[in-house]
Structure formats: structure tokens, C-alpha cells
Amino acid sequence: MEVKTLGELCNIVSGGTPSRSKVEFWKEGTIPWIKIGNIKEKYVNEADEYITQAGLDGSSAKMFAKGTVLYTIFATLGEVGILGIDACTNQAIAGLTIKDTNQLNTDYLYYYLKSKKNYVNKISRGVAQNNINMSMLRSFELPLPEISKQEEIVAILDKVFAIINDRQHELQKLDELIKSRFIEMFGDLKKNDKGWKILRFSDFAKIDTKMIHDFEEYQDYPHIGIDSIEKGTGKICGYRTVKEDAVASGKYIFTPEHIIYSKIRPNLNKVALPDFIGVCSADAYPILPIKGKCNRTYLAYVMRDKVFLDYILAFSNRTNLPKVNKKQVEGFSCPIPELNLQKRFEDFVKQ
């Protein structure tokens, strides 16, 4: 099978941001200006900000035609979408315009880029700003079967992802039900309208950082990086073993008794409940609830709640790279209901 680079197959350029200080670049703008947060589905049809023609002409922003494939290259890496409208983007997004559509199918390119997400996050590690440059993107190699075969692959993947999307919508409804039950049982934790006893974090949990550097006996253990934890839901997915990831730097041990909390970019709200033993990135904290004081499931949902998120973001927003430390987490206080009520909530979640 023929293999070509993205640079051979596509014209690839990044977007730009018109100066915010120039009102005429933004006021009454009509040109959609796409940001990472707008890439939520396969097709990108909406923007929440618009620029003027003067803003487009007076900046590095570029107009991309409907059908252009968008790929995020800065901060949140590897998000992919296909423009359903003519639009421009900020500099965190690259636009890929296929040179010859008889050689490369747009949807095939979309699915190929989706498959590269773990790879781009891996090669970007160690880069201070968490990004990939245009040269790296242009060098990605793409297997290139005949166009008819590409269309067959796309048809199969469309069906697969339709099933996945349906399942995700079901899980989203379930997650909303759980959050609703949480509020029903425990009230608004910020107001503590049910009058629960307030305890400091260190009174009901501890940050249990047992770091290992020698991985000889841990080769078959799951290795959970922060990219393996889904934002908001805490679902653990896409991980490999210590051996497969060729882990060399220090990691933390965790068990099914721990919560894994990502301390990097806490706005992503990555709070996981593992049901196996493994090692996790040093960019996360294994948190161990104290028996007799706090239930693991209850604490995980507290940490996903606005009461914890607002508290922790007040610290992380003061730095260029949002990150929280041990002292800040341990300084958190929250209502701790009776254990039997926490257990009832856990039983509801497990149903």
C-alpha cells in the first residue's frame, strides 16, 4: 500500500487571532472564528465568536472553506473536525485542505487524524506548551489505499462511531441522573444547605504518593497517564502497560481503593475511580479516602462538583500552566455526610 505524508497530500496552515485591542476587528463581526472548544462533533457548524473582514485582513487569521479538516495543535491536542461552514480559526488549530480529492477522501483523513490522538499527545510530552509544530504535522505518514477502499473504510467507521455516539449519549444521560441524585441526597455543597459537618481534606483523605523508579516487577501493570482519563466523567480508556509505554520516569502506585486526580489543567476535571492496580503519571495524585470517614465514590463526585472545581481553579488560574499542588488540595474543606448515606449513594451509582 502506498504511504504519503500529510504535507504531500494537503495544504496545511494554522489560523490566527486578530488583536483584541482593535474594536473594529471584532465589533459586529460576521465571519465565524473557531476555537478548540467549538470542535465537539465530526462537523463544526457553529462559532461563539465572530470577526470582521478588517480583522481577517489585519491579522494572521485565514479563511478556510467548508470541508476543510481542522486539527488542534496546541494545548488540547488531536481534536478533529470537518468544517460545515466557511470559517477562520485561532492559531491553536491547523486547517488541512486536500490537494486532490480523487486521491484522498475527506472523511478518511478525518478518521486517520482521530486515530493519531494518543500518538500526538505522547510525542508532545516534555514540550513546555504542550504542542506539535507544523513540520511535525506535515511529516505524519498516511496509508493511502485506492479511493474506493477509503470510501469502504469510511462507511464502516461511520456505522461504528454512530453506535459509539448513541452509547455516549446514554452514558451522558446516566451521568446527569447520578449528578441529580447527588444533589438530591447531599444538597448544594457550597451552601451546605443540609447542615453536614465540615471537615478539612486531611481529616477524611490523604494524598498517597508512593513513587517507584524501578519498574522491573511492574512491566505488566497498566500505566495510566492523564490523557487516559476522560474529562468530566473520569472514564479510564486508551491505556497501555508499563512495558508498552517504555516507562522510565517516576510513577505512583494506585489500587482500587484510590481515586486518581489529575493535577495538570484541573479545569478538565479528570477524577477517576480505577477498579484495578496500576501505576499513574506523576502529573496525577492517587488519593486514598480514610476508612470510617469518607466513601471513595462520594469523594470522587465531590471532586467533580463545582464546590471543589471553583476552589481549586482559584489557585491554578494564577499560573501560565494550570497546575495544583499537594498543599492546595489538602487545604480543601467540604461537608461530610453520615457514612451510611454516602454508601447509599455509592450503591445507586453502581446500579
Positions of predicted regions on the chain:
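Short coil/turn segments at secondary-structure boundaries
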Residues: 19-26, 126, 197, 214-222, ...
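A short beta-sheet element
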Residues: 35-36, 46, 50-114, 250-252, ...
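Contiguous mid-protein beta-loop-alpha structural module that forms a pocket-lining wall or clamp
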Residues: 165-166
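Non-catalytic DNA-recognition/assembly elements of restriction-modification systems
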Residues: 1-17, 41, 139-155, 170-212, ...
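A short glycine-rich beta-alpha junction/loop motif
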Residues: 2, 73, 87-94, 113, ...
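Sequence-specific dsDNA recognition surfaces
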Residues: 7-22, 37-66, 202-213, 226-256
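Periplasmic-binding protein-like
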Residues: 120, 308-311
